[in-house]
Amino acid sequence: MKQSTILRSASRRTALKALIAAPAALSAVSAWRPFSAGAQEAADPASLGTLNFIVGGIDFRSYDEPENSDVLMIARVDLINSTVRAVAIPRDLWVTIPNFGEDKITRAYDYGSKAAGSDFKSGAEAISETITYNFGVDIHAAIMTTFDGFAQIVNAFGGVNVNNPYDIYDAEYPTADYGIKEVYFPAGDITLSGEEALEFCRTRHQDGDDGRSMRQRIVLRSLLDTARQSDGLSLQDLVNANRGAYRTNLGRSKQLALALAAPDFTNDGVSFATLQNYIYPSTASNGAWIYAGDWSQIPGYVQGFLDGSIDGNA
């Protein structure tokens, strides 16, 4: 696998800050000058306590095509205890989308966005309301990355080293021009470029959503390790490399608070869970293949995992 040139400049501390705070930190620094010294002093991370995010990867290629979310996670960031707990939500999970009816959860953002003329804020509100309605979790903000944006941030770290548990082959991986291509990732230690990391995280034809969710966790943890072990990147390096990679409706003062708190987070404080024990393959009334869920159990499991009273399964 091809490895990109590693950008180098400041300390490991700022690299870790950029990675943990992720899109929030990038957004904050890209608009750093409007923050006065007083505003920075007022951005006390501990005062925010915990924040719930819906984090997703959205296909923003064309207005004429659905802006579906291929990747969705409900993430709780605890700024007091420096922990992140995230639940992966399969894109094909059948849910109620408030104001739009029942459909796969992947469609929620698109319904809200297109109803307002391709508006990010409306799309973010639609997916947030969908999470609250179905899972009973209030969402404070949505953070969405484009496909290209994800690749950009991986390349900003010079690629990512992962340990792939088994060979992955996909003969029909969807390309940016709406075609298909073959992708292959051998088992073992491999180094992925940004584009390859995106393919690694998105492919699911061989092992479904469970496999894809596992690979996403592998990449996220490996990126964190990369940030800690490298010579480091300045936050400004990442901003320059990733302008436009993310969209968020998180207020700027909270973005700054996240950026300030990020150095206190470590890989040990990051936990993941999946819904694999509470979902099963099914068919919707329109004939679509879906995941149906045991909704007598899912909300309690998700809420319990996020608040730390239930251990994760990933």
Q: Which ranges hold each PLM region?
A:
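Non-catalytic, solvent-exposed segments at the cell envelope interface
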Residues: 15-16, 34-314
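N-terminal secretory signal peptides
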Residues: 1-10, 18-29
